[in-house]
Amino acid sequence: HSRGHRYAPENTKNLLEWLEKENRRIVNNSRALELEISKQKQIEELKKFEVNFPKTYFAVNKKEILEKSKNFSKPFITKHNRGGRGLGVKYFQNIYELKRYVNGKNFEDSIDGITLLQEYIDSDPKVITRIEFVKGKFLYAVQVDASDGFELCPADPCNVQDKFCPANSDGNKFMILKDYKNPEIKKYEDLLKSNGIEIAGIEYVKSKDGTHYTYDINTNTNYNSIAERKSNLKGM
């Protein structure tokens, strides 16, 4: 829906369920789609596989949003349960800033009526890591310069190729990491296998004390051709 196709998820769900009933070969089934369009379900899976994630609450109206925000004593963010490209993610230093936003004319509700409130993880440098999986197995990890905000879509149409990003040593917004190791990769692979997901990109942010906080499972993942060309690795 964030790319101008409001009912694409609903139509795709019907198609996938029909194909499943016909026992057709499917890469990323209807369960993969369920996770793609619900961050609430993603959190449930992360919890099930004991993957660390930011403190998170869910709200279904403005009153609940303000009430749940009282659980935070430090900066936090709000995001839509059905998101996409980081659109709709807002940063707040305190409940008073949130109250002005929620009661103002610029408030933007989630398309499914569910809003997440999540602790803000401060990182230095301002980067996140996206781990790509193909056939349910680790392929590579890409470091993403997040200094410009939360819209971190890796697809080529989303990016200005000649923009220099200082957080990555090669100057590109997306940089594939060499000799990458992460003890949670096995947990990620187990989670994907349990849900019948073959292709995915899982994102986490590392806090200043080195703790990993996983916050997103992308089952409609994209690849960045510049980063892949520089590393000689390909997702497709």
Locate the predicted segments by residue:
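Active-site nucleotide/adenylate-binding loops and adjacent lid/helix of ATP-dependent enzymes
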Residues: 21, 31-127, 179-185
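Hydrophobic residue at the +6 position relative to the catalytic HRD Asp in the kinase catalytic loop
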Residues: 202-204
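Phosphate-binding site of ATP-dependent enzymes
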Residues: 90-195
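C-terminal active-site "lid" helix and adjoining low-complexity regulatory extension at the edge
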Residues: 179, 193-197, 206-236
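Protein kinase-like catalytic core scaffold
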Residues: 76, 116, 139-140, 200, ...
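A short, GP-enriched loop/loop-strand-helix hinge that lies immediately N-terminal to
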Residues: 1-37, 52-55
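Generic beta-strand structural signal
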Residues: 58, 133-134, 206
